[in-house]
Amino acid sequence: MHPTVKCFLCVILISFLASCSSVTGSVTTTNAVNSETPEETAMPATSPTPTATPTAEPPTPLPPSPTPSLFDIELPVGEVKYEIPLNIRHVTEDSATLFFELDTPSRGYVSVRSRETGAFPFTIPLDPSQARHLVTAHNLVSGSTYDALVAYEAEEGGYSQPRFLDRTWGPVSFHTRAEGAPLRIGVIGDASFGDKTTTGLVDAMADANLDFIIHAGDVVDRIAANANPFDSYKENFYAPFEPLLTMMPVYTVPGNHDYDRDINYEGEPFYYYAFPPFPDPRFPGQEYAERNQHYAIAYGDAQFVMLDTQVFYGEPGREEQESWLEERLADPGFKVTIPVFHVAPFNSSTVHPDDSRPVRGTWVPKFETANVLLTLSGHFHTYERLMKNAITYVISSGGSSVLYAKGEKAPESKLYKRESHYLLMELDSETMTYTAINLEGDVIDEVTIPLE
């Protein structure tokens, strides 16, 4: 790299730090905390009690010189690689949680810039003792667009961006929600093979001006022989979902294949390593969960309750989840609750149709006595809309080319379409509307649900 460019880049980083209005620490799977001198908290392995870790010493800057913005310079792709590429874990009206992991601990920065004003409300040094970073930028402006960037200090001097599959990743941007604005959500399920059908659906959702994505489970399936889970996720999830992961949060629930033994990492499903808990001010404490097995996200008067149906088939955590679900369903602070989980309580599939029984027997009675009008599920590799006692149960699991045939029609079934598809869901103060759209862009179903 030319010495002048090295100088330019370092000086820009100085200006970033000088302009920060909110600075938080670089951490390992934890929420960063606002302070003048950042104090960091490390995600505990088994305990919900946060543990402080030292603040990273920033790289040594070079003497000042007028420079263009670091965001406007094409940083070279360096030798450090993303094991998990920079993605938007969660966004609220005034904050955003970012997550990534490098293949080696590195000195550098993560920075956020306002696209409207050019201001840098968030710039922190990376902790050079850590490769994994989950950081939250606070004091953002609602209804605004921000760019995010990771730059590390290269051995030969200057700054580089991490590489992803021998290429660049991103650029990464996100939009904070304006208070009271209607929601636009994309829903997809069982998009677990990284095939061309999935990438086509992802591209369509990326062009739909969405706030976030809901993934109804089975994130990655069919792991190649001797492949490690990092490589499998890169090829089957991060690469095909890149147009979405670099623009908005993708909220997931675990499916049965997310527990497959061939994708474990350090004795646990890699799913939980890839999707760590994150902070949400309306659900304090959930960022300290040992597993991100069940959690909630809130947007205005709606809460999305994310659940794990594998507890019905031998996975631990059922009793704890049931207690938490009852608490969420009873919360009077929300006008509507939308449960999201992998195995639907009703189905008309030829493939494992009996899987619905424990879900149906346990959760349907609870939903019917709460403010639930709609649930979102996957598992059966099709589109199906079912209804019972004024609740619409949607199966949206046509996220790939692998589709299941229709079996005996369930009494609750209103429509069954064996088509690859995604859902476009719109939610305002009066109605929920969702549209099922196939790979060709044709509407295969559309439903509007009044919010009572």
Task: Name every feature range the model reports, one short phrase each.
Residues 220-223, 332-350:
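Short acidic, glycine-rich surface-loop motifs adjacent to enzyme active sites
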Residues 1-9:
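Bacterial N-terminal signal peptides that target proteins for export
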Residues 182-253, 258-259:
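Conserved, compact domain cores that house catalytic/ligand-binding motifs in diverse enzymes
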Residues 87, 151-173, 227-333, 353-357, ...:
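Extended active-site neighborhood of metal-dependent phosphoesterases/phosphodiesterases
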Residues 22-187, 192, 203-208, 424-452:
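Acidic, histidine-bearing metal-coordination/catalytic regions of metal-dependent phosphoesterases
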Residues 100, 190, 213, 218, ...:
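Divalent metal-coordination and catalytic microenvironments
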Residues 340-346, 375-383:
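Histidine-centered catalytic micro-motifs
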Residues 18-19:
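C-terminal motif of bacterial Sec signal peptides marking the signal peptidase cleavage site
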